[in-house]
Amino acid sequence: MDQNQLDPSVPSATEVKKIPLVIKVYAILCILTGVSTLPSVAAFMWQVITSLVNGNAAEKLGDNMLVAIGLIVAGIMLSAASAVILIIFGLDLIKNQRRNAARLSYILIAFTVIELLVDVMLQGIGPFLLRPAIQLVILVALSATVDPTLRQERELQRRLQEMLDRDAAAEGMLGRDETGEGYIKLNYFNLFWVFFVCCILGLIAEDIWHMTVDDPGVYQDRAGMLFGPFSPIYGFGAVLMTMALNRFYKKNPIIIFLVSALLGASFEVFVGWFMQTSFGVVSWSYSHMKLFGMPDPIAVLTGGRTCMGFACLWGLGGLIWIKLLLPRLLKLINMIPWKSRYSATVIFTIIMLVDGVMTLQSLDYWYQRVNGTEPDIPVAQFYGKYFDNDYMENRFQSMTMSPKDATRV
């Protein structure tokens, strides 16, 4: 009697297909990395405890000792958890348990991204980021290919989506959420162009605000990237707002306002804290803000990284965004010619990635020059020649650099 091919308990032909040799080699490397990481993590944890007990942690950890210790502990816990998952992930690959390996790859991707952020805050930009960066690329590739059933599902969905997109374009609904639960379809194409356009619109809005409110009549370049008219905080903020508010677009405006205010203010606090912790850079401060003649309590609690007034502006901005601007932006996005929309997205993604990486590197070497710790290497010499302190101060006019505020170890 033939086996029921629809029975999920019966492996399909693609599921029993052998894992390629190169992936098996990678699986062994994952296991070895995980096994070797655990004792290294334990040894490093012992060094941290010893330094704290002996009282010489302040010398090693700098002025922001508590923040540095918190980041180190978080990094240790993250490394230990990642090591265990890497071992299980490698074993699953060897055992040909593709679906479970695919699930674990998503967890490892999230952990690796957080690990990269923690490493930047503790050590800045350097060759030590290559390992997690390469691992991230491999994991992203594996997550899409290791499970052939998932790959086939994606291919079928892609072909179906192309037909649906063409039908939607004919009906004027291209880019909309077909389920009706949200306004916009949350795919990479839509979100990237939301990010790109809002990087520019946000910079224009901030420049106008500075010239009319902060310092009337005085122009200041508020750009946040090394090249181009981009302010990424508004780009990422718009993406977060779009993802968070997508299913709220039919809700009560008060709810949209409150969700936007909380999300926007929290994001502003995180970005300000990350930049100050990583590079000693402060781009804005609301410490001087008052509320009914008293110090703004939110500004006090967040170290001046946000305040009640700007939280309300985030709330109003989110409401205007989801109700008025997003529908018009979607129409603008859909003006990109059908045959070139994906190639254009890839090209501009690469441009923004290069710009972003060079921005972080230039900030890192600016920090090291001011701190007197710049290494004598070709990359540092390149940034020192073409993007020296005067250039950085002129390019990032709203930023102040204070190395003592960073938590470099």
Which residues are covered by each model-predicted region?
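Aromatic-rich, lipid-facing transmembrane alpha helices and their immediate juxtamembrane interface loops
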Residues: 2-409
